[in-house]
Amino acid sequence: MASVKVAVRVRPMNRREKDLEAKFIIQMEKSKTTITNLKIPEGGTGDSGRERTKTFTYDFSFYSADTKSPDYVSQEMVFKTLGTDVVKSAFEGYNACVFAYGQTGSGKSYTMMGNSGDSGLIPRICEALFSRINETTRWDEASFRTEVSYLEIYNERVRDLLRRKSSKTFNLRVREHPKEGPYVEDLSKHLVQNYSDVEELMDAGNINRTTAATGMNDVSSRSHAIFTIKFTQAKFDAEMPCETVSKIHLVDLAGSERADATGATGVRLKEGGNINKSLVTLGNVISALADLSQDAANPLVKKKQVFVPYRDSVLTWLLKDSLGGNSKTIMIATISPADVNYGETLSTLRYANRAKNIINKPTINEDANVKLIRELRAEIARLKTLLAQGNQIALLDSPTALSMEEKLHQNEARVQELTKEWTNKWNETQNILKEQTLALRKEGIGVVLDSELPHLIGIDDDLLSTGIILYHLKEGQTYVGREDASTEQDIVLHGLDLESEHCVFENAGGTVTLIPLRGSQCSVNGVQIVDATQLNQGAVILLGRTNMFRFNHPKEAAKLREKRKSGLLSSFSLSMTDLSKSCENLSAVMLYNPGLEFERQQREELEKLESKRKLIEEMEEKQKSDKAELERMQQEVETRRKETEIVQRQIRKQEESLKRRSFHIENKLKDLLAEKERFEEERLREQQGLEQQRRQEEESLFRIREELRKLQELNSHEQAEKVQIFQELDRLHQEQNAQSAKLRLEKRRLEEEEKEQVQRVAHLEEQLRKRQDTAPLLCPGEAQRAQEEKRELESIREALLQAKEMRAGGDHTCRDELERAQQYFLEFKRRQLVKLASLEKDLVQQKDLLSKEVQEEKVALEHVKCDAGGDPSFLATDDGNILGGPPDLDKIKTAETRLQSREHQLQDLLQNHLPALLEEKQRVLDALDSGVLGLDTTLCQVEKEVGEKEEQIAQYQANASQLQQLRATFEFTANVARQEEKVRRKEKEILESQEKQQREALEQAVAKLEQRRSALQRCSTLDLEIQEQRQKLGSLHTSEWSGWQASLETDGEALEMDPARLEHEIHQLKQKICEVDGVQRPHHGILEGQAVLSSLPPSGGNSHLAPLMDARISAYIEEEVQRRLHDLHRAIGDANHTPADVMKSNEELHNGTTQRKLKYERMYSRSLGTNRDDLKDPIKISIPRYVLCGQGKDEHFEFEVKISVLDETWTVFRRYSRFREMHKTLKLKYAELAALEFPPKKLFGNKDERVVAERRTHLEKYLREFFSVMLQSETSPLHINKVGLTLSKHTICEFSPFFKKGVFDYSSHGTG
């Protein structure tokens, strides 16, 4: 067992951190790493001091932040410290794993892969591995087989980096072998012979790896890469076979990243999410393994069941053996030294600290047969030791010695057999490894490659070519082309005039045909072909201008060899390309003259050979020239490529320079914009100051001009007053006459208003009488019947609840209790049906009686009208009214009133009482037809009926109280009318006396003025005194007259306001009567009553406004009476009242009036001061927080519900059960609420903070949707068209007691 080795490496600061002026927060001393939190002030003691610096101890701490530091650790030192252990473990037969962990841009890829000038761990480990392999192979100590694979995990999908592009790039699946563990299906494995092969594959994989630029790293790895080396070694150690298989996982992880720091969006954001998901799973695996290791270290502690979530991520699944399994694992935590990355760095250090506690179980992975051989040899040695220790003579004779010796021989034979089998298998493996799919055989000093399939052998005149290229032509079609073809080619070639899809070799039953594609250049034996051509043994094929091959057909060659042995063919013909022609004509020629023919053919063949040799030489020369041209062109391409690279590097440098310059320019632009904004603000402030100063100057100038104008007016006024004194006398006479006429008109108007008031009171009395006529239709026993039925239903409910409790307690007698309760309920329904039938019969009789009375009243009314029509004393006026004797007219009105009353009663009976009774009877019949129901159903039905009975009883009580209130209101209105009449009579007397006094005073004043004016005219010496007296007299008259005029205007306004006020009060009383009329309807007409009420105006449509209406009427009447009495006293001019007394009485009167107004405004402002625009969103509700209440078993959470209705706001505290009760109750009344999603009840976790926080959000959403539905529902009392401007806190509380603030709701410690 071995723990995971953990190393921490800190990188230098990058350009981004330097631009942010980040501080260095990492210190390393030997194996200790310390991180400092600069946000906590230095010098703190206690917890704050400990929180400022945190120190961790690891196996290794690599300080690579400063190359000039003596403690600087280079790539080479990291390899010597960690990489040599990996190579050593691999040669010992252990699995090994190295992975780097850290945030994005912390140096993971640099540590693992390095760069072109400074290789990382992966290249150095591979190089060291093959260096040791070569050293071992040189001394023939062992043989090795090495396979590599390279994959990446991108967006939780596995991709093979060493496979050429195809449609299955990301479709590799991860599976798990029961013994070998997780593996990737169809992952390509590549045999390598040396480090250059590994380096080539590694470079190819790195090119295919997914990288992108983010806000924190220009070349950020967007995937996890795993480079795996499967290393097999076999050798004989002291004649003991030894075979071990090691897997080395070299992992380069992508970095964890925050979206706000990297600025990732779109694809980058999705990649970052998948990267973080796999890294979080890796952290969870590390934590779980650390917990398991700690439990294993403490055997006395009870072990916990810890689940390790390997399969939550593809990364952790593939590294299952490396984390807590059969592997020697090294974790390298890479961190940033900057304070801007403090959180990520601390998280990385904590994960690394947890990883130290993981315990792995590495074992040597040896072959099963080798292990068995080793165990058998150990057993043989033990048996030989036993035989050598005992008495040889005694043991040889005993049966035990014979059995031991026999077992010894069996084991030795088995060891030899297994050793031979293992040696043959390994040698065969090595031969297959060397020979691949070809058969090698030695012929003299040469080596012959044999193959059974048709194949092509490359003819290459490249001076640097040292190998032989052989391509098999499989059964079917073999495609030849370039690497950039749209489809994958079986044979990939390069050269001049070679098309991307050049040709096809078709092998059909041993016959091979060459098919050129789209006019490609193909030659067979020097002849250009354009159509499909069959190939024969030895054919020379030229594809393009530089790719030449020889076609070999083993089966055809074997047939030709057989024919040559039989003497049918010459030895020369087998080596030339015109073999087919010779085969066709040879038989006939040989039969004609075999000897001469042979000599002739030999000469022809020699000539042909010579010509072909020359042709080949020419072709070779041409090929050399073409090759030289190709090399020249390649050199030119290489030169241009290098120049392109130089230009690209310059472009990158220029781009970086442009980026830096643009960054500086942006910063300068930002500074300039900020300076411009400051300048604009200062300029605006200066402009505002100047504007304010200009306004002040204009105001002062305006005031000066006004003062000047006033002075001028005053001067002119003083001049004009002298002239107006004499004109005032004439005007006083005229105004006296006009005022007298106005007072007479006021008297006449008061008399008319008195008549109208009397008529209104009579009309109100008539409406009250109609309402009283309708009231007898209500059966007096209805309330008593409802009370009795409620008591019976409550007893049934108690019985059902008792049966339910007995059933929950497991009592076996609960069934009998349930049956008795249900039978009692059915008996109650039967009695109720009998009562309803009796009521129905009474109502039918009452309907017949009312119908009969209506007919009689109609007949009587007709008789009265006929009698009145024949009387000549009745005269018809222009407007159609009948004027006659008062007794006859009273009879007609009385008869019409009785007829309307009876018709109204009959209509109310037919439309409301009778249908409601039939509906209730039908419900009882349905309940009886359904028979005995379940406990819960019966209990629910009983609960519903109890609620209905309670509503009926409350409705009856409200009807009675409202009828009584209506009567009291009528009496009060009649009293008010009588008081108004007295006030008007008193006002008439006051006006008459006032007019008389005013007339006398004016006459005396005019007489005095006339006398004094005549005296002034006679005596010129007294002009100044007369002028002064005139001014005094004029001022006196002016003040007196203005006082009288103001008094008269006040009286006139009061008199003008009286009809409007009285008319408004009568209108309010009418609305109230209509409201009471709607509420007085019986319980089975509730819905119809609500519909009628909803059609009334908003100001009088709700019954809860009745107290406000009474208070308003009382306040206005009291105010008017007090004002008129005060005016009366002031008009009389009581001599006993001093000015101080008058002011005191006025103040008292004003205070009383003000108090009454304030009282009324407080009571009625909510229903009158609302704007229509506020009804767009009248109710706002939220749950800002929740509190923990109670102790022990009663501990629970309560939610603070904040309700705002227009300008009223209040708060209640409710627990979750109250929400659920309200939802269940209102859902039965309003079907629309059933569609709302209510947060479900949970059996566990009700006291968990996360559950409560989530429930708070759901409840808040539910309440908002709840009010939205109720405001739009036609059946809801909160419908916006019904409540209108009267929507208030009172309306919401009446709708449901859930929103009513109770006694314990004034703090957060209520019971909810």
From Swiss-Prot:
Coiled-coil intervals, chain numbering: 366-425, 835-913, 941-1073
Location, primary (coarse class): cytoplasm
Alphabetical list of CDD domains matching this protein: KISc_KIF1A_KIF1B, PX_KIF16B_SNX23
SUPFAM superfamilies documented for this protein: P-loop containing nucleoside triphosphate hydrolases (SSF52540), PX domain (SSF64268), SMAD/FHA domain (SSF49879)
Domain FHA: 480-544
Gene3D superfamilies xref list: 2.60.200.20, Kinesin motor domain, Phox-like domain
GO molecular function, one term: small GTPase binding
Domain Kinesin motor: 3-358
Record keywords: ATP-binding, Coiled coil, Cytoplasm, Cytoskeleton, Endosome, Lipid-binding, Membrane, Microtubule, Motor protein, Nucleotide-binding, Phosphoprotein, Transport
Protein function: Plus end-directed microtubule-dependent motor protein involved in endosome transport and receptor recycling and degradation. Regulates the plus end motility of early endosomes and the balance between recycling and degradation of receptors such as EGF receptor (EGFR) and FGF receptor (FGFR). Regulates the Golgi to endosome transport of FGFR-containing vesicles during early development, a key process for developing basement membrane and epiblast and primitive endoderm lineages during early postimplantation development.
Protein name per the record: Kinesin-like protein KIF16B
Species name: Mus musculus (Mouse)
